[in-house]
Amino acid sequence: MLIRNPFKDKYYSHDRRALNMLALRVPGLAFILMIYIASIVLQFVSGGWSILLLYAFTILIAIFALLHWHSYRWVKKRVILYFAVQGLITFALANLMTGFFILVIIGLYAFLIGQIIGMADRRRTFLILYLLLLLVINSAYHLHKGEVLHFIVIAAPIMIVIITYAATFFAQVDEKIKAQLTLERLELAHQQVEQLTLQNERQRMARDLHDTLAQGLVSLNMQLDAIHVHLAKGNTERAKEIIQQSMKRVKSTIADARSAIDDLRSKSEEIGVLKERITSLMDHFIESTGMACLLDYRLHQVLDVRTAENCYYIIGECMTNAAKHAEAKTIWISIWDDEKGRLHLTVKDNGKGFDVEKGKKKRGHYGLLGIQERVRAINGQFNIKSTKLKGTQIEITVPIQGEMQDE
């Protein structure tokens, strides 16, 4: 994912050198203007310039400043061309000066060397040598033998100060760019975490509502169908019994729904012994559907609340699917742990079975999807086997985060 440029989106977003040049545009332009004004004042004070030379000097300085202003555009492919042109312009400007006033132009050479520090990488040494060569030629042309030592004594400190300032400036710009990019990456990561948190919370809400309200309503619907059949046959006593069971089931569903809503508001509390909850769930299904439910519980470790809660809802969803879709007569539930600290959960029925691949792709059936999401939420592994007319078997393996119980 692209990170927005701290200065301008349209510029080279990830090019540190281009950003350095962007940061240098205004202070660099001010420095060039200072060189221009100082050169004009000194030459006119000495009385050694004509109007024609003034025009030529002004035009060259303007071109130099214009190229500097757009230096960020030269970074990627035309770095050598940029410094070659700027070096020649500086060379020409120095030749327009007279006598010792070439010291003013030293500032432009030092300025270009400072730009090389922030703009060029592998070709830095070559470009610096190129500019120093031009400076030596300028100095040799303008200075007499007796002036060379004075020139070096004055010019060297000036260049060192300007180059040091440029290096410090670019180092500060680099740190600022890194800080801004880091801040933007952190903000982006924070937004992504918020989005993922919201998405996960929505998925959890969908699972909880499905595992409470949807399962309860499915069970109630089956009981109402049974009541209708018994009333049609005149078996009012049995219909009354099922109505009583339905009322209990409605109360239980309401309680589960409230528990799910409370869970959205606060952290999950301990849900009790898993075996007792599964047994209670099986009793409800036996009463409402007439199915036979067999439990093989050989768990020796205490499950954390999250794992126990998800296992409970997975079993409930499997039983609902077996009653609603598979038309099963018997359900076998097995729970055990192994020596490697893993929980094994198997739910098997003798229903009509189904095509597993088509079942995974079928839209609108949140049961299988909900099981997969719950298994993923507890870092488990999920496997489903189904054969037509022979039933379905769901196998789940989950790492246990608990301690061994005392025998």
Swiss-Prot record:
Membrane topology, Cytoplasmic segments: 1-25, 68-78, 121-125, 172-407
Tell me which EC number(s) this protein carries.
2.7.13.3
Where it sits in the cell: the answer is: Cell membrane
Report one GO cellular component. plasma membrane
Query: Which keywords has UniProt assigned to this entry?
Result: ATP-binding, Cell membrane, Kinase, Membrane, Nucleotide-binding, Phosphoprotein, Transferase, Transmembrane, Transmembrane helix, Two-component regulatory system
Query: Which pairs of positions does the record mark as disulfide bonds?
Result: none
PTM annotation (Phosphohistidine): residues: 210
Q: Name one matching Pfam family.
A: HATPase_c
Q: Which residues lie on this side of the membrane: Extracellular?
A: 147-150
* Start and end residues of each Histidine kinase domain: 201-402
Q: Which CDD domains match?
A: HATPase_UhpB-NarQ-NarX-like
- Topology relative to the membrane, per the entry? Multi-pass membrane protein
Question: Matching Gene3D superfamilies, A to Z?
Answer: 1.20.5.1930, Histidine kinase-like ATPase, C-terminal domain
Q: What does this protein do?
A: Member of the two-component regulatory system YdfH/YdfI. May activate YdfI by phosphorylation.
Name listed for the protein in its UniProt record? Sensor histidine kinase YdfH
Give the species.
Bacillus subtilis (strain 168)
